[in-house]
């Protein structure tokens, strides 16, 4: 979530999620315990879960967790417990969760929110607040101490979300995929393109690199277009390596996705990357999303870096200039 710190107030301005049935298809009552790094998006996560239909409680004392869960009766719960919480202990929280998971009527999951040290420091600088574990010391000291303290919880979490590169909309989309209450047990797939120069999406479950395909960037007529435009799509689709690659990709996914679903996974992110995130990856991601829909999956599609401003293009490599002079028709 670059650009602004995560707070309940900033999350309130995002599009609301869709609340639905109280229980998922298996009939168990959902309980989501939200923890993680201070500044990593805990408040935003609780607000998003509340919009999905959960009753949200923040900064609950650990000693009250079990009592609250059973006093809530039929309601799905989202409970924030983190290092600010009075009597907080990672080991004690894990013991409480194990005890709750022993109840057959509950589906208890641990959600861990985090971000990189650089992003966390920037968020604290923007809010001018001290770190809760380093009130009279530099913020980096508090971040390092908290990350060490929370290692057991991160390792035990069913869902880990790194918000470093995510917008609030992205976080809400991921939370909706993992924790929706519509009773639909099927696997939802989100396909996104991205630029390697801006980093691999941290939320991706599967990543595929299409930088081996011929790059439309070197054709001046195609450079300002995107992989959603027909001329670029035709250019990439004509690459002799594309048909075999796409066939192998779908052959891999065809048996893999049902296995994910059988293991209880409800949300899967597939990321397709190229250098600039505008041509090859966009076309391939769009093509893959269409194939997945044809297979009956519920599919979301995004293109992370499509509208990102890029630096001025570098000169074409010498071999590309020679080839262009000799066979200009191949690069129109």
UniProtKB/Swiss-Prot annotation:
Keyword field: ATP-binding, GTP-binding, Nucleotide-binding
The segments labelled Disordered in the record are: 1-27, 302-332
GO molecular-function term, one example from the UniProt record = GTP binding
Q: Does the keyword Transferase apply?
A: no
List of residues binding GTP: 82-85
The annotated regions of Low complexity compositional bias extend over 10-22
| Biased amino acid composition, Basic and acidic residues | 302-312, 322-332
Which positions are annotated as binding ATP? 36-43
What is the stated purpose of this protein?
Displays ATPase and GTPase activities.
The UniProt family comment states: Belongs to the RapZ-like family.
Q: Tell me what this protein is called.
A: Nucleotide-binding protein RC1_2868
Which lineage ranks, top first, belong to the organism behind this chain? Bacteria, Pseudomonadati, Pseudomonadota, Alphaproteobacteria, Rhodospirillales
